[in-house]
Amino acid sequence: MAKKKAFIPFFYFTSIVFLPWVISLCCNKSLKIWITNWWNTRQCETFLNDIKEKSVLEKFIQLENLFQLDEMIKEYPETDLQQFRLGIHKETIQFIKIHNEYHIHTILHFSTNLISFVILSGYSFWGKEKLFILNSWVQEFLYNLSDTIKAFSILLLTDLCIGFHSPHGWELMIGYIYKDFGFAHYEQILSGLVSTFPVILDTIFKYWIFRYLNRVSPSLVVIYHAIND
């Protein structure tokens, strides 16, 4: 009976780890057809009206320039002009398809992540007792570690998150989140987040060491600073 009770929180933790992947897989399959039909039937004509408007305008200006070029080369043979017009027509259709696929992709991924967040929040709320048990296990495990191992683990974690080489890792992580939500890659926003987020984490971590670790385990703080130096 005790083993069964101990297995339940472990199963709950495993389900939390794999549940987002299952939700994402199911939602992508079930929502993609509905969102595609909704977009293609133009029910979303007022939705995302201003998003990418500038980019769309620039693309059509480029196409307009191509048509102006068409007028400039009328002295070319008629067969070449027909091929030229056909090429412009194909490029226009291709651009419209890419534009629609981008918005469908954005709506799909944003909806999937929102649904995953709601389901996981409800799942975590109804499983608070199991989370408390898992938390007690983690605290007991950390308490049994020596101060040297704790200091080494903290130093390793901080070097990975806010160390010298951490910006590249943050760039990959934030870029993955952007891609997962279906957003376009904006270099300026990405650079701003990469340059500020580790600094904020570093400040929070130093405050945590000063307020919490100094009160709970002063020896751990001494060992941490000794290893860090």
From Swiss-Prot:
Matching InterPro entries: CemA
Purpose of the protein: Contributes to K(+)/H(+) antiport activity by supporting proton efflux to control proton extrusion and homeostasis in chloroplasts in a light-dependent manner to modulate photosynthesis. Prevents excessive induction of non-photochemical quenching (NPQ) under continuous-light conditions. Indirectly promotes efficient inorganic carbon uptake into chloroplasts.
Cellular compartments per GO CC: chloroplast inner membrane
Membrane topology category: Multi-pass membrane protein
Primary localization class, coarse: plastid
Domain of life: Eukaryota
TM spans (from-to): 6-26, 107-127, 189-209
Any one GO biological process: potassium ion transport
Molecular function terms, GO-annotated: antiporter activity; proton transmembrane transporter activity
Keywords noted in UniProt: Antiport, Chloroplast, Hydrogen ion transport, Ion transport, Membrane, Plastid, Plastid inner membrane, Potassium, Potassium transport, Transmembrane, Transmembrane helix, Transport
Reaction catalysed by this enzyme: K(+)(in) + H(+)(out) = K(+)(out) + H(+)(in)
Protein name: Potassium/proton antiporter CemA
Localisation: Plastid, Chloroplast inner membrane
PANTHER family (UniProt xref): CHLOROPLAST ENVELOPE MEMBRANE PROTEIN, CHLOROPLAST ENVELOPE MEMBRANE PROTEIN-RELATED
Any coiled-coil regions, as ranges: none
Family: Belongs to the CemA family.
Upper taxonomic lineage: Eukaryota, Viridiplantae, Streptophyta, Embryophyta, Tracheophyta
Organism for this UniProt entry: Draba nemorosa
